[in-house]
Amino acid sequence: MTEKLFYEDSHRTEFTAKVISCEEAKDGYRVVLDQTVFFPEGGGQYADTGVLGTVNVTDVHEKDDVIYHYTTEPLEVGSIVTGKINWEERFEKMQQHTGEHIVSGIVHERFGYNNVGFHLGADYCTMDFDGTISKEQLKEIEAAANEAVYQDLEIEILYPSKDELKDMDYRSKIEIEGQVRIVKIPGYDVCACCAPHVKTTGEIGAVKLVSMANYKGGERITMLCGRRAMRDYEKKDAMTKEISALLCAKEYEVADAVGKLKDEQTRMKSQIAELQQKLLEFRVAEIPVEEKIVTVFDSALSGNLAREMMNRLLDKGAVICAVFAGTDTDGYRYVIGSRSEDVRPISKALNVAFEGRGGGKPEMVQGSVKGTGKAMKELLMQYK
């Protein structure tokens, strides 16, 4: 059994311990100490990292009350080592985890929903609830959670007896055997939890509920607390300032500026489409259709316009029409059609000769090819 020093003081970062065992493991070694500050993976929270002496600790697991430290190098059995956890990583995780307890407690109290899933990753934290939450309710939850932070409430850790536990109203996702550890945030939450937490709610700094999505009939909320929330704000603030400068708009008016830009883009697309149609009409009018196969190469045609040009030239009287959009450098997209001929052999010939892909029905084929327009025209001459 490993003595769990992280339960005595969640802010403790260094300790000394005796090496009980050291065994080879996948990608390193598995070390057992008589006591540790390293928290193993559990309760939805991933394990601490750090060092034992000069050896890196990459992961920590627990089984049958024994904590296993996975290291990059071996440690001598019986030796005394000094361990140190990555404090910034631990503190950030505690900020997220205690923030999750507050939010889950508020949701449970106000709406009666249970937290049915929790993931604390390296970059974000998600909570799954078994009921639906509106955008307005999400704002209310966030405001209430931050009110708990402002109150700087002391986090209470309780180890109730079985009799005390029977009379205690607390949240728990699973049935727990043995001693139950309760994390209590006065006025907000009482929950069974095995992970270390901050000492007061003020240490969380801030709670930001950044997104919400429907998930398995309920809601999945993504949250950032403390330092993570600050980094997220700094990144978004920098982006807002950059967009503000690009649009020559005040920071709090960038959404309106983007909306105007989008409207302008829609108008321009409409005007471009009208001009493309007029240009297409001029192009079709000047292309002769006396030959059996009419071939058109144009670098500016989109897929829809290429198909429309083909149909218009067929309407004009072309027996077979092949339209190529692209360049010798970038390759070509082609569409070939006919009202009376099977054009699939032409597609097959192009694909073989020019590393092409594509096909279709007897009356129309589409695809892409690589090569020069000159060489493609020479191949198509065979069908005149």
Regions found by a protein language model. Give the residues of each.
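A glycine- and charged-residue-rich anion-binding loop/surface
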Residues: 1-384
